[in-house]
């Protein structure tokens, strides 16, 4: 689940309320390369009686391959992990700055406060996209084309700071978490996706991003590599879309593997 901290359309507390309203019992806010929404989401989750897993989704190189690594049950203050995601946040910020410059030159979005993105602790192109779509200034396709063209002039090593999958997994493990390959069906080059499987602890098999015929493929891959199969929605609330809880229940073995990393409200109150 994603919030306005990265590229989601709803605030962290609203995302947690939606999860509770739809009967979810354990949730994780997995914003891209950021933890700024954790406290707000966890506070609401615990007030609503949900277990909470501190988590994030780490972007890895090359970014166009969508080899995103979920870190579940991580220490959100761990220096190695914070240093890693700061590198990616720097790339995102330069992307956004370049895009905002192009939009301003074209006279698009003036008066909408887009310049405020320069002061946000984290920023992604998807956050700018949200504003453009909400005000009907561009179609989604045109907006992404505009964003890509804005960074075409960047040097070849522009994306070099983004970590490799191995770096991401190592940092997640160092922070005490479990590493899960998110939505493997979204990776254009499936051979590159398979290279990551020996590194991770789990595979996100059950997600709305997978077609029905893809599920057995990733079940077989998970079994072959001894990976726990996880459940996710990859919810972004795009264009105000409602939240639909997963139809597959999380494997109890994965919750057992997470153990004390799942923060239950009773534990918080006792502390």
Which residues does each predicted region cover?
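Extended substrate/RNA-proximal surfaces in nucleic-acid metabolism proteins
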Residues: 43-191, 254, 259, 265, ...
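Nucleotide-sugar donor-binding patch of glycosyltransferase catalytic domains
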Residues: 243
């Amino acid at each position: 689940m994603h919030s306005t901290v990265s590229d989601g359309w709803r605030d962290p507390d609203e995302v947690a309320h939606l999860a509770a309203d739809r009967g979810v019992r354990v949730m994780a806010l997995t914003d891209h390369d950021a933890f700024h929404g954790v406290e707000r989401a966890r506070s609401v989750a615990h007030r609503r009686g949900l277990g909470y897993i501190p988590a994030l989704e780490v972007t890895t190189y090359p970014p166009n391959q969508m080899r995103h690594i979920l870190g579940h049950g991580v220490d959100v203050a761990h220096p190695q992990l914070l240093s890693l995601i700061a590198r990616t946040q720097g790339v995102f910020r330069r992307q956004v700055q370049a895009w905002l410059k192009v939009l301003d030159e074209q006279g698009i979005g003036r008066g909408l406060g887009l310049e405020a993105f320069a002061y946000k602790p984290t920023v992604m192109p998807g956050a700018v996209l949200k504003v453009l779509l909400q005000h009907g200034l561009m179609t989604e396709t045109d907006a992404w084309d505009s964003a890509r063209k804005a960074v075409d002039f960047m040097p070849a090593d522009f994306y070099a700071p983004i970590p490799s999958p191995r770096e991401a997994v190592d940092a997640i493990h160092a922070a005490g978490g479990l590493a899960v390959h998110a939505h493997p069906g979204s990776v254009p080059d499936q051979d590159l996706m398979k290279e990551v499987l020996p590194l991770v602890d789990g595979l996100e098999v059950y997600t709305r991003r997978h077609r029905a015929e893809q599920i057995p493929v990733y079940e077989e891959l998970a079994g072959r590599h001894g990976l726990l199969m996880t459940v996710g929605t990859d919810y972004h609330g795009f264009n105000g879309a409602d939240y639909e809880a997963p139809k597959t229940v999380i494997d109890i073995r994965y919750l057992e593997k997470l153990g004390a990393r799942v923060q239950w409200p009773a534990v918080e109150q006792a502390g």
